[in-house]
Swiss-Prot record:
Known EC number: 2.5.1.75
Region (Interaction with substrate tRNA): 39-42, 163-167
The protein, known as: tRNA dimethylallyltransferase
Keywords: ATP-binding, Magnesium, Nucleotide-binding, Transferase, tRNA processing
Example GO biological process: tRNA modification
Organism: Xanthomonas axonopodis pv. citri (strain 306)
Keyword match Transferase: yes
Residues binding substrate, per UniProt: 16-21
Reported cofactor(s): Mg(2+)
Residues holding ATP: 14-21
Known catalytic reactions: adenosine(37) in tRNA + dimethylallyl diphosphate = N(6)-dimethylallyladenosine(37) in tRNA + diphosphate
Origin: domain of life: Bacteria
Entries under InterPro entries matching the protein: Dimethylallyltransferase (IPR039657), IPT (IPR018022), P-loop_NTPase (IPR027417)
Similarity-based family: Belongs to the IPP transferase family.
Amino acid sequence: MAVDQRPLAIAVMGPTASGKTALALEAAERWNGEIVSVDSALVYRGLEIGAAKPDAAMRAAVPHHLLDLRDPWQVYSAAEFAADARQAIAQIVARGRLPILAGGTGLYFRALLEGLSQLPEADQAVRASIAAEAQQIGWAGLHAQLARVDPVAAARIHATDPQRIQRALEVYRISGRPISAWQALPPGPRLPVRVLKVVLAPRERAVLHARIAHRLDAMLAQDFLTEVRRLRALPQLQAVAAPLDLPAVRAVGYRQAWQYLDGAGSLAEFRDKAIQATRQLAKRQLTWLRGELDARWFDPERDRHQLEDAIVGFLADRPAVRQASGV
């Protein structure tokens, strides 16, 4: 059997608030790595506190990639992410360093690790037309349109997911072919690195829920709401007819804060809604991660030694690895 000679990389996966950022930083410092963000909120400029974006000290200690790529009124697709991530990984490998893929956006991980079919490129005029229709008939009405032309995609896409509804209709209107047919085509070439997938997830749901609540309270203490007020004051966002349909504003926490600042409920109600939305996100992430059959799961508090052993074993054949203190 042929030996897989591809360079190595580590994917640090897990639900929100599970400790992925801390592990990625520790691993990068120990094994001469650079971090590639796999997070759909971190690509947006201005999303800092609510997205738990690595701060200046973290970025000074370890190189980070795929942060602050778009303004919050723009869109960034999974295909764009996969292309940018491949380029970043190739550059990291060329420098003789270890790529560490860290984040919790399942669509981005799938696009990168499994590949995507070659969908038609985005057409801003078509997107604008669909957005205008949404203002008239709502996203539920557009979802019904999608169900008529692509029932397979409509069954997979929730009626409250405007970004995916818009993309599916855009592809159909550009090409005349349902997006589900495009997605059934063979994916692109495999990733030119061999990846160890590690999942950080507390064994008890109550522990994860407590971490989620603690992180939200820490965000509020750091003046998260002022950050959202600054976003709301941007002229480009004020010019958007439906800002809550933008991917950046729909990011968990930001959407609930935006609605609160619109006058929807009390501060306590905002906190409860944000915590509940984050729990729901974590639940979806865990559902996706259970389908990653080749991933290895670790409790972030209990399994530190087992996690270290798994990484050390994976990297055993990697030459010239510089190490510092333990994970």
